[in-house]
Amino acid sequence: TKLFKPAKETVCSSADLTEKHFYDSKSGKTLPYRIYIPKNLQKDKKTPILLLLHGAGERGEDNLTQIRNFKGMFNAAGDIISGSIILAPQCPSDCWWNLDEDGCGDEKGWLGAAWRLLESVKSEYGGDPDRIYITGLSMGGIATWALIDRYPEQFAAAVPVCGIGNSYSAYNLTGIPIKIYHGTADTTIGCGASDEMYNAILSAGGKMVDYKRLYGVGHNAWDTAYSDRDMFCWMFSQTRPKSRTGDDSYTYKEKIKLVSPRNTEIFSEKDIDFYLLESSEDGGYSIAASLNSGVYDTLREAYEKNDGKEFTVYYYGKKLYTFIPGSEPSCEEFVFASSVTDYLENLIDY
């Protein structure tokens, strides 16, 4: 086995978001927020920004709770989002993500303050105006719909989760890539709200809206949304010039994959049912991947056809290690080398 140093340090976690406060002179409000700045940020290179809008249950003044329901994205797509500025403001207790406060269009509400925070961060850190992404859950899902309705030209992509939008202004949203998530068993905000928005956008001529209607899922649709690596691959492939032409195409980026000596992909995380820890011969532990039906046969055949040749394991797009199989795989699973267990820890939910 030949081990290569993986780029583990390029994967951010929720713990990397630092605590700050923003004073909004227009409304007189002070907005707590957390922010992640990519390592080696270069302002002249223009960096994408991801705005996270929490739900009603995460309101407060601790400047921490607002990231609680977003943590799944760091495990699922930490490598993808680590190249962006991540912004997570917190709405105070007993308040709401309202754009306006005293009158229509005044933008003195807490969401108005969050919008100006986004503008301030974009200016201070060299944010890319063509790659501004937004997502929110529940109350934050409602806020996501509200912001893209008010500023449809400012966002490259949006992911409202179990929210409510204004279907009467769906024509505003036909030029922005949108991916909606909502559980059919949601008793807090019924999925009819997302059904209505999806159908309204389609009726208005929108061609870049997708709807993940999650059967049997309750109000916690965010657990599915933010563990969906495919969604983040899609999101971070969107840019304003491209999306305005109706093109929201993208390429999936594997988190982990095995490649044969002939440079053929044998499996990726999409082919893995679950991971588990197993005792290794050296007294430590290895991580094993239980493979989907049929993939085991593909792996076994690849071993037979490439006997004595090197296979390669890639992690977050970088070569992790190579190995020459000693025998055919057993128990329909693939066991990663014990020497890389520490690097693969985030694959397992302990």
Region roles according to the model:
Residues 245-350:
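A structural signal for conserved, well-ordered secondary-structure elements
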Residues 1-48, 142, 197-199, 209-210, ...:
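A domain-start/cap signature at the N-terminus of enzymes
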Residues 49, 56-112:
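Active-site machinery of serine-nucleophile hydrolases
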Residues 177-181, 185-248:
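C-terminal catalytic histidine-bearing segment of alpha/beta-hydrolase fold enzymes
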